């Protein structure tokens, strides 16, 4: 309907029930007024002013709106709703222009907000189909800047600034808000198309009809000023839902990337790439706008963030996503033996898969073992909706979960599974841990357990909480327990100098308050503490053993010599070197080694790295009776190096530490991964 050079311009102005002016549309308030005027560009004539009052769904006007517009709530009760008001607008413009074959018109607004931030978002929420004329428009501010480059900055430009630049006198003809702006815009347009400017309105702004999916290469250069992060999305939302939330703004092709958590499930965040910085800035104004009943937070992000989620290099994925305008559905929970024929039979004739077998992409681990996930292409929305109705139907003996997916999610899932499994396979331990000769009796209840601590509690808070009993804590005797996410669990264990002092501390400190929370204090033994720190649970019904103590359904596939108590390097990096070199086992000194599979649970609970005055031993690492001894380096420290070049040698590492004090007897321990190394350093603890 819109030609490159239209015959008519329709000046359009909107008013909302909330903020107006530069903040128009930022508060999600509904439209309450439409004003427009038709301008004949060929004859340079301005038509009559038209005005329609619109009844919003929520008849509430802000005080600012009432003051500026002089509109009262009573004026809106008999007004038409937005859909009827837009029909009146379309019919009025058509009648006035007497549109025939070859006649064209285009909307013209003061800035981007009226169309992009008001009409399109509200119409999308109310499922109103906007006329085609609202998908292209002229931004009078931009056109004015092209015609008059010496005018004010576009961010400071408005109707009054443009009128002042052209020397118009201020009019007082209209008292209704918006009417004077429409009059001034008409005069400005007529002036621009007349002598001496003779400006032609061409190449209008475009609003995308729909979001286009696509792929993104990791090698692509992306402008940081075009990326936002949306947070708080419903877990079932798709890229189309994101595009609908940002309706009116142009998202780049394939520019909506849903983020996944460590388990491969959506975490409620998405990274969105827009076509320009201007559209990104408008998107930021939708911070805390609503998607259904949830408000969405919108923040700036970087191109690097986007590439981590949406970027990919797999030719298989690129070929799978090469078919455009396809709806992607993700299947989860497939039998590991499922074939493409079984997937096609699962969907049946009601929802045919695009391209048959070529429209199915199975997700596999690096060794080609199936993960139970697959992505399927459908040619249209109808087929996809029919497919989603099969959610939790059976394929074989397993029920299948179905979700709408995106091209970016395909890339992300394939990248995640092809690079490494979600749960790393256990690796052989490599760091010897020397046991301390002293082993405390397990039946002595010389420990106390604090339960219900504030999550922000520190060791200093605990010492203050215990008061006089803090003097009875063993050296390095405070154990802060972390959960499997590495965050404080609200529990702590304290080793006291005697069972009597532990008993008195439990009696006098039980249910005392710490930062407005009462804390429970129980007397316990070293054995009970050891069980909890290994991942077991301690409750009033007794001890629940940690995962690594549960009966094995099948023996481990491999074992390692039990020459020394050992921990994996991933766990070792969490602790101070003194903890690794001077351990104290709370287990009997019988030779013991947990199978490699048990190491998966070692981080279920962990020590908080304590300063001097807290524990110096790792009680849940079992010790062997016949361990070969080595002089402890009490003043040394362990350094872990990550990210080394694969061709790095010992000389390169020693040169790197030039200037630090290390002695020839310091140990250099290679790790299985060639890009890692450990160096014992006598003075400092450095993590690289």
UniProtKB/Swiss-Prot annotation:
Gene Ontology biological-process entries: mRNA processing; regulation of RNA splicing; RNA splicing
Could you state one GO cellular component term attached to this entry? Answer: ribonucleoprotein complex
Tell me if Repeat is a UniProt keyword of this record. Answer: yes
GO MF terms here are:
mRNA binding
Q: Which InterPro entries match?
A: ESRP, ESRP1_RRM1, Nucleotide-bd_a/b_plait_sf, RBD_domain_sf, RNaseH-like_sf, RNaseH_sf, RRM_dom
Q: Which residues form the RRM domain?
A: 226-303, 327-407, 446-526
Q: Which Gene3D superfamilies match?
A: 3.30.70.330, Ribonuclease H-like superfamily/Ribonuclease H
Q: Which SMART domains match?
A: RRM
The listed locations are:
Nucleus
- What positions belong to coiled-coil segments? none
What does the UniProt keyword field contain? mRNA processing, mRNA splicing, Nucleus, Repeat, RNA-binding
Q: What does this protein do?
A: mRNA splicing factor that regulates the formation of epithelial cell-specific isoforms. Specifically regulates the expression of FGFR2-IIIb, an epithelial cell-specific isoform of fgfr2. Acts by directly binding specific sequences in mRNAs. Binds the GU-rich sequence motifs in the ISE/ISS-3, a cis-element regulatory region present in the mRNA of fgfr2.
Report the sequence similarity comment from the record.
Belongs to the ESRP family.
Report what the protein is called.
Epithelial splicing regulatory protein 1
- From which organism does this entry originate? Xenopus laevis (African clawed frog)
């Amino acid at each position: 309907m819109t030609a490159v050079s239209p015959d008519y311009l329709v000046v359009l102005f909107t008013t909302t029930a909330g903020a107006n002016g530069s903040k128009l549309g930022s508060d999600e308030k509904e439209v309450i007024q439409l004003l427009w005027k038709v301008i004949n560009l060929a004859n340079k004539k301005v038509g009559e002013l038209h005005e329609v009052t619109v009844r919003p769904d929520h008849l509430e006007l802000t005080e600012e709106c009432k003051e500026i517009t002089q509109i009262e709530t009573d004026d809106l009760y008999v007004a038409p709703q937005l859909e009827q008001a837009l029909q009146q607008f379309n019919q009025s413009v058509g009648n006035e222009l007497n549109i025939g074959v070859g006649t064209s018109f285009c909307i013209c607004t003061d800035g981007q907000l009226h169309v992009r931030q008001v009409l399109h978002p509200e119409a999308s929420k109310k499922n109103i189909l906007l006329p085609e004329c609202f998908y292209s428009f002229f931004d009078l501010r931009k056109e004015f800047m092209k015609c008059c480059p010496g005018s004010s900055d576009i961010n400071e430009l408005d109707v009054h600034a443009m009128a002042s630049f052209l020397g118009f006198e201020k009019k007082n003809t209209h008292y209704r808000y918006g009417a004077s702006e429409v009059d001034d815009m008409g005069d400005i347009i007529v002036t621009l198309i007349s002598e001496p400017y003779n400006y032609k309105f061409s190449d209008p702004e475009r609003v995308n009809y729909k979001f286009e999916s696509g792929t993104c290469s990791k090698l692509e250069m992306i402008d940081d000023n075009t990326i936002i992060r949306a947070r708080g999305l419903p877990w079932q939302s798709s890229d189309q839902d994101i595009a609908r939330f940002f309706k009116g703004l142009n998202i780049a092709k394939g520019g909506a990337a849903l983020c996944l958590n460590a388990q491969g499930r959506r975490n409620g965040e998405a990274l969105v790439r827009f076509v320009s910085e201007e559209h990104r800035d408008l998107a930021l104004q939708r911070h805390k706008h609503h998607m259904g009943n949830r408000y969405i937070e919108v923040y700036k992000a970087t191109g690097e963030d986007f590439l981590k989620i949406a970027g990919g290099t797999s030719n298989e994925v690129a070929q799978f996503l090469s078919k455009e305008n396809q709806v992607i559905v993700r299947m989860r929970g497939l039998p590991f033996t499922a074939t493409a024929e079984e997937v096609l039979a699962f969907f049946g004739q009601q929802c045919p898969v695009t391209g048959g077998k070529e429209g199915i992409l199975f997700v596999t681990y690096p060794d080609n073992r199936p993960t139970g996930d697959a992505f399927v292409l459908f040619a249209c929305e109808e087929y996809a909706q029919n497919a989603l109705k099969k959610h939790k139907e059976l394929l074989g003996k397993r029920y299948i979960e179905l979700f709408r997916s995106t091209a970016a999610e395909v890339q992300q899932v394939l990248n995640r599974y092809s690079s490494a499994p979600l749960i790393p396979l256990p690796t052989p331990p490599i760091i010897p841990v020397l046991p301390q000769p002293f082993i405390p009796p397990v039946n002595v209840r010389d420990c106390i357990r604090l339960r219900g601590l504030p999550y922000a509690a520190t060791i200093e808070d605990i010492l203050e909480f215990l008061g006089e009993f803090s003097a009875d804590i063993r050296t390095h005797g405070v154990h802060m327990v972390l959960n499997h996410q590495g965050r404080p669990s609200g529990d702590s264990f304290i080793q006291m100098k005697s069972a009597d002092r532990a008993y008195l501390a439990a009696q006098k400190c039980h249910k005392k308050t710490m930062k407005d929370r009462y804390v429970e204090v129980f007397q316990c033994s070293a054995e009970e503490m050891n069980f909890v720190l290994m991942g077991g649970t301690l409750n009033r019904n007794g001890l629940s053993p940690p995962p690594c103590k549960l009966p094995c359904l099948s023996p481990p596939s491999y074992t390692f010599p039990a020459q020394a108590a050992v921990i994996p390097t991933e766990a070792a990096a969490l602790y101070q070197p003194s903890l690794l070199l001077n351990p104290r086992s709370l287990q009997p000194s019988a030779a013991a080694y947990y199978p490699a599979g048990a190491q998966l649970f070692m981080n279920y609970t962990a020590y908080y790295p304590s300063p001097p005055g807290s524990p110096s031993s790792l009680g849940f690492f079992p010790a062997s009776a016949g361990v070969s001894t080595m002089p402890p380096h009490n003043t040394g420290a362990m350094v872990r190096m990550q990210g080394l070049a694969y061709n790095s040698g010992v000389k390169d590492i020693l040169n790197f530490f030039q200037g630090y004090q290390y002695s020839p007897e310091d140990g250099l321990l290679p790790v299985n991964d060639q890009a890692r190394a450990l160096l014992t350093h006598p003075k400092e603890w450095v993590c690289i």
